[in-house]
């Protein structure tokens, strides 16, 4: 891989969609669908430049080994289960991550993704997300304050520089469940945040 996928480096995207799926057919259908999807994303980027659209197609360990013929991604491995089910491992074959400033554009791109991948995949989960007021998550706190800022700094930590994987990245996806009732009872004093947006 020589070109960084458009969804790796953007900052401050307001909305996102994550689609996770398993492979139904052979990997060649997945390979062709990925190419079609990348072309579709470029079309949407040209049509909606204000959306700051980006997308990522990522593969699980087993599918990557089939796609690559066993080359590269030496550190890619299945996620182990931790904490007696507190950190379950869903381990799907494919992740499509779509992000931009406009949810309706994301939705259109997701529809294009599902059309491109078609019968090659079995969708297991589709999640729509957004950043709340002032880029806060639903806990009421600003999210991502410790993330590297600026494209060059982000590139330094997120993109592989050399070798067969140059331009590629590893993706680690987590989903957190917040107890909003409990969080809303907590004081924000001393948290580094002056107030909540509500």
Give each language-model segment a name.
Residues 1-198:
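Long, histidine/aromatic-enriched segments associated with O2/redox biology
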């Amino acid at each position: 891989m020589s070109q960084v996928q458009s969804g790796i480096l953007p900052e401050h995207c307001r909305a996102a969609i994550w689609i996770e799926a398993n492979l139904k057919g052979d990997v060649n259908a997945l390979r062709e669908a990925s190419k079609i999807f990348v072309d579709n994303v470029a079309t949407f980027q040209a049509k909606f430049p204000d959306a700051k659209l980006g997308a990522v197609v990522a593969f699980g360990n087993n599918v990557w080994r089939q796609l690559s013929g066993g080359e590269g991604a030496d550190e890619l491995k299945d996620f182990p289960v931790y904490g007696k089910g507190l950190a379950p491992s869903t381990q799907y074959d494919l992740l499509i991550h779509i992000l931009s400033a406009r949810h309706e554009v994301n939705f259109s791109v997701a529809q294009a993704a599902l059309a491109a991948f078609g019968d090659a995949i079995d969708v297991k989960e589709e999640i729509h997300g957004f950043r709340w007021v002032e880029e806060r998550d639903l806990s009421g706190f600003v999210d991502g304050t410790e993330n590297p800022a600026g494209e060059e700094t982000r590139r330094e930590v997120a993109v592989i520089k050399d070798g067969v994987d140059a331009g590629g990245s590893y993706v680690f996806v987590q989903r957190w469940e917040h107890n909003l009732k409990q969080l809303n009872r907590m004081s924000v004093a001393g948290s580094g945040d002056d107030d909540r947006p509500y």
